[in-house]
A protein has these predicted regions:
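Basic, polyanion-binding surface patches
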Residues: 1-218
Length: 218
């Protein structure tokens, strides 16, 4: 029998950490929809590079217009404040070789440090914006701020859209066939922790990658 429920949080769903269900929707812990993760780089008010692990995003557009929509950006974060001030940011996709670097970008985000360097990455100059890119990234999207929207009035998070002004793709990644393009050296996915909907018990999450099932087109 399927688990069926309305939008009201189940009574047996208790927070694993303070503010959990203020920042994240409880349904996310049932749906467990995987999402690609990346490092977004921005510039702090004094021009020092900022780097932060992000996800909860989609990529869309038409013709010569390509956009990134970040839907879980915390309003109090350095990333959001920097984008609002400078109107620029860069999306940097990195492989699973850099999982430890990802963690460092979360745990060590002090105001007075170069977070790209501190996370173990190398900076390189972007070609359309002032924000630096991460050299180790196999796919970089240089973006300018387009718009933002609260999905819920007075929300903790903001949904933000950026227009991609310039793309930089690793030669091997860009030329590979689909059978070779996705794997250990490619996109990393966050498989978020879940909740047992019947007991409220926490189920551990993880990190994943794409496994090609069939070479075909839809």
């Amino acid at each position: 029998m399927n688990f069926e429920h309305n939008q009201k949080k189940p009574d047996n769903f208790h927070e694993d950490w303070k503010g959990q269900f203020k920042i994240f929707p409880w349904m996310a812990y049932i749906s467990a929809i995987p999402h690609v993760i990346y490092i977004v780089t921005t510039l702090k008010e004094d021009g020092t590079p900022n780097a932060a692990l992000e996800g909860w995003s989609s990529f869309t557009g038409e013709s010569e217009n390509f956009f990134v929509i970040m839907s879980g950006l915390i309003k109090t974060s350095h990333t959001y404040q920097n984008i609002k001030r400078n109107k620029e940011f860069c999306i940097n996709f990195l492989s699973s070789d850099y999982l430890d670097n990802f963690k460092k970008s979360i745990s060590e985000n002090f105001d007075d440090i170069d977070e790209i360097k501190n996370s173990g990455f190398s900076s390189e100059q972007s070609l359309s914006i002032n924000v630096p890119r991460i050299q180790e990234s196999f796919l970089k999207l240089e973006c300018e701020f387009e718009w933002e929207k609260e999905l819920v009035p007075n929300s903790t998070n903001i949904t933000l859209c950026g227009r991609v002004k310039y793309i930089s793709a690793d030669r091997e990644f860009a030329m590979n066939k689909v059978t070779e393009r996705f794997g250990k050296k490619s996109f990393v996915f966050h498989l978020m922790a879940m909740k047992n909907p019947y007991t409220g018990e926490r189920i551990s999450g993880g990190i994943g990658k794409i496994k090609l099932l069939k070479e075909t087109e839809l």
